[in-house]
């Protein structure tokens, strides 16, 4: 699971509406990929986590994957 994910430099690009971007930070089982694997900074990873959680609550993204 050593895939390099391109993280945008603009922090405004990371929000709950950009589901195609934040889906890359979710594993096959539906869990958020840790910071040490994605090689993102602490600040960016917190923004990503917040965006994923907001998208899940609104209903844009599932909490669990269907095949798991």
From Swiss-Prot:
The keyword Plastid applies. SUPFAM superfamilies: Ribosomal protein S18. The lineage of its organism: Eukaryota, Rhodophyta, Bangiophyceae, Cyanidiales, Cyanidiaceae. NCBIfam families: S18. GO terms for cellular component: chloroplast; ribonucleoprotein complex; ribosome. Keywords: Chloroplast, Plastid, Ribonucleoprotein, Ribosomal protein, RNA-binding, rRNA-binding. PROSITE patterns: RIBOSOMAL_S18. It is found in: Plastid, Chloroplast. Part of the 30S ribosomal subunit. This is Small ribosomal subunit protein bS18c. Belongs to the bacterial ribosomal protein bS18 family. GO terms for molecular function: small ribosomal subunit rRNA binding; structural constituent of ribosome. GO terms for biological process: translation.
